[in-house]
Design a protein with these regions (language model features):
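Ampiphathic alpha-helical segments that act as solvent-exposed interaction surfaces
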Residues: 114-139
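Alpha-helix boundary/capping residues
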Residues: 20-23, 77-80, 132
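Short, hydrophobic/amphipathic alpha-helical patches that form generic packing surfaces
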Residues: 13-19, 72, 124-132
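Small-side-chain structural scaffolding
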Residues: 2, 13, 107-108, 119, ...
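Charge-rich, low-complexity N-terminal segments
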Residues: 1-64, 69
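N-terminal segment of the canonical double-stranded RNA-binding domain
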Residues: 40-119
Length: 139
């Protein structure tokens, strides 16, 4: 039976922390050295938790990396983006894919663009979508 991925792995969490600066994180990894870590769920958002506790972990030399559950990742993906020229609609497609489409009218021609991001599971699909939107400066 396949195991369902419910949250970002440590490498995804590190990259998302650089992109999102912990925005929307609802859990965190406590890191003990390079390879040993423990996952902890926050009863409040990671940002709220960090206000009260991160300094204590820093003093104890325990590195803390924000982590995102599937529901937290989904909530970060906008349904629509307007970049000044385009309206981009983001919808959930089939096979764990998010489909980004946008319309642009230029010289009376209608152009339709589609970007499809797929992965083996929804956590990876959300991660790839957030990463791609960041690279496109749309997040």
């Amino acid at each position: 039976m396949a195991k369902i991925k419910r949250y970002t792995d440590i490498s995804q969490a590190r990259i998302l922390d650089e992109i999102l600066l912990s925005k929307g994180a609802d859990m965190f990894f406590k890191c003990f050295g390079e390879e040993t870590y423990d996952l902890t769920f926050c009863e409040v958002s990671y940002s709220e938790w960090a206000k009260d506790y991160k300094e204590l972990y820093d003093k104890a030399c325990i590195k803390v990396i924000p982590c995102w559950s599937l529901s937290a990742l989904i909530s970060l993906i906008p349904q629509e983006i307007f970049d000044g020229e385009y309206v981009i609609n983001i919808t959930e497609g089939s096979d764990n894919r998010w489909v980004l489409t946008y319309d642009h009218y230029e010289n009376r021609k209608h152009s339709y663009y589609s970007l499809s991001i797929g992965a083996d599971n929804l956590v990876d699909a959300c991660y790839e979508t957030i990463n791609k939107l960041h690279k496109l400066k749309m997040l």
